[in-house]
Structure formats: structure tokens, C-alpha cells
Amino acid sequence: MAALGMGPGAEFDLLRRIFARLGDAAPSDPLGDDCALFKLGGTTLAVSIDSSLEGVHFRRDWLDFMEIGYRSAAAALSDLAADGADAIGLLVSLGVPRADGQEHAAEEIMAGVAQCAQNVGASVLGGDLVRFDRYMLDICVIGSVQRPVRRAGASEGDGVWVTGYLGGAGLALEQLRAGTRPPTALRNRYACPELRLQAGRWLATHGATAMIDISDGLAADAEHLSAASDVGIEINLEQLPRWEGVDALAAAASGEEFELLLTMPPHFSDASVSTFRGDTGVELTRIGVCLRGGGGRRGGVRLLKDRESVTLPPGYDHFRQ
């Protein structure tokens, strides 16, 4: 079985044990990337699946039903962005509880899914509808990709870059948990995240060597890139682009940002950054560098603040005790 290119954590330790039991059913390509890739004629398809569960990924007192559908679809489609893929379609398994006075909930949720799909030129291809003890969506996304970018391609000397601004989703979540309604723009960062599919395609065609979407938090997802590519990653916290009112360490820990963390060759220039911004309307910031890997002293991820190492903030882990 191919190696599982993931960083540390209880969730990923469990995945390693699960994949070790797959035997001949395991794929030959490395497991643990954002999408599975396979050829269909002359087309390379990118496929991924993502779950959103009430009480874990969303709460009904924070989001309306359309937002629940939109956010769930965005989380799934973001995996396609991380591979540089175009979105084709979605399959949705929707679980709804028994009558709770919300007779139009399923329609509203699916309207939100459809709106998110339409925004990236994708279709809702079908799915399944079941009774469940709470609201739940499993969304399978299908895309096509010309130049896939995986987590395993970074090399020593590559620059580490990130799209957009970090920390907004975490700040919005903090305010929602405190019972405060965030300002509209900040709330939308959590409720209706912007997708980076166009940015992912641009980066893929302009030489990105490795890429991942930020779902568990910048620091945690950098560990996945480091493990998959067998390089060290050094990130300068002072360089992190972040929302107003968010400190650098909080920005590095904020999950479900759905921005792209990526590596580019050393020759990627300021002129290329300007072209990217002009073509996509998205910010792109260099935040660090890839260092020697292969078991060397500089493997793993190191965060620097004022040139001093700081403790990595933990990313989200479904199975942490």
C-alpha cells in the first residue's frame, strides 16, 4: 500500500490503521491527499467526499438552512481547489430528523447546495435522502484536472505561500460561541466561504509544487504538507495575512478558512504575484520557506515570531481526547 502522507494527530493515526487494513483494495497512489485521481479516457477526474454534521460542523442557531447547505458544499468543493481542478458536479446524501416544525428544511438546505455549485459552474447530479437523528450532509464532489497538484511535490528552497486572509472564520466562530452576531462580512467568512477554485487552477498552471486547502488550520495543514513532501516548513508569523483584530497565532490556528496553502519554486516572482492578483482578484502572500527534510534536523513545521520558535497551535482533530 502507498504511504499515507499526513501529519500527527489522533484522527490521522486512526486513518493510518484503517488504511493498513485495506490490503489489495488500497490504491497504488499515496493516500491522504485532498482528492482521489483516476483516468477516464483522456480525462483525469478528481473526486472527494466531505461530511457536515449538526453539532460538529454547524449549529442551527448560527446558520439558516440555506447557509448550512452552502457551507457544506463549499467545504467539499474546496478539496477540488487544492488539486487545481475544475468542478463538474456534486452528489449529496442528506439526513434530516423527524418533523420538528421545519417542513421546508430539506428544500432550503439543497437550495444552498445548489447556489454554491452554480457559483463554480457545477451541477447537483443526485444523491440520497434519509431520516437521521440530526441534520447531516455527505457531499461527494467530482472535478476534472489538467495538471494535478498534490501534497507531496514540495522541495527544499520552495517558497511557502497562502491565498487570502486568515483568521476570519475563527474570529466569527468565537463570536458566535459567545452569543454575539458578527458583522456581516465576518459572519459570511464562516457561513458562506469564498471558494478558491479559480485560484487553484491558476496556481496549478503556473508551477505550484504542492497544495492543500486550510481546513484544520494553517499550522496543522502545513504539517500535512511537510509529511507528504518530506520537507521542513518554516513559517514567519509576522508575514501571515490576517483579518483585522486577529493576532498571528490565532490566524495560524484558525480552521475552516478554505484558503490555499501552497509551495512555489524559488523563482516565483513579485511580477507573478501581481498577475495572479489581477487574474483572480485574490491576495497571495509568501509566508515561509521549505527546508531540508529526509529525517534531517529541520523536518516538520516551525513557526517563528521575532525570529524565535513558538509552539504550534493544535489543529482541529475529531478524535482528540
Go through each PLM region and give its residues:
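Residue-level signal for inorganic ion chemistry
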Residues: 37, 76, 84, 124, ...
